[in-house]
Amino acid sequence: ELFMGDLKRYSIKPLMIDDYSEITDILKEINRRLNHNNVFVSGSAYEYSEYSEDEKAATDFIQSLSQRLIQKGFNIISGFGLGVGSAVIYGALQEIYMKNQRINDERLLLRPFPQGEDYKAMWKEYREDMISRAGVSIFIFGNKYDAENESTVLAGGMKQEFEMATEQHNLIVPVGCTGYMAHKIWEEIHEDLSKYYTNVDDELTVAFKKLNNKCETSQLIDNILSFIDLFKNGKHTSAN
């Protein structure tokens, strides 16, 4: 205790533990708090029809979401997904420039995926790196074009990112109304909210359901941000 008192004089706050295994939990909590303002936006879209037949309406939603996240003080991480990445970047830069801020990796971190068959083995590492830097993962759309069958299919990469984000204890925010894989993820979580979130109550349940409601762009973004806000005061957290 005398040694602990000496540490406090140097503004070092010691933490007592009962068991060595608690160190892992403490480190996880430190990492969560460090990353809680970092948002990973997972999305790809060859088409947007399950959300809107108007492509511009879809890209406007993505841009506005990105802009509002920056406004709220969040930092954005993006893998530059097809049909989504450019809109994410545009929305973020628009807000950063409006506030005369400098662009850096803290506010906007981009990790474009290397293309070509030889690079596909690296994609898993790319995903893990991005998600490890985030505290929140938002899932939108999630489809791609299958040239072999000449059709639009669900994006398996988004499913992998969902699984990784869950393992990393990210706050999972599936915007189900955008359709495709994002809707599949919303459905999976909706079946058992307590598997992904703690202290599930009526407020959280209603907020989660709103992520699947089609509405005006501004209202949808409000629904997304309101859901995230529920986890800010510590009442709710992502489930371990």
Label the model's feature ranges:
Residues 1, 47-238:
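Acidic/glycine-enriched connector segments
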Residues 1-17:
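Domain-level recognition of nuclease-like catalytic cores that cleave nucleotide substrates
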Residues 7-9, 34, 103:
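A generic structural signal for short, non-catalytic loop/turn and secondary-structure boundary residues
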Residues 10, 239-240:
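C-terminal, charge/polar-rich interaction regions
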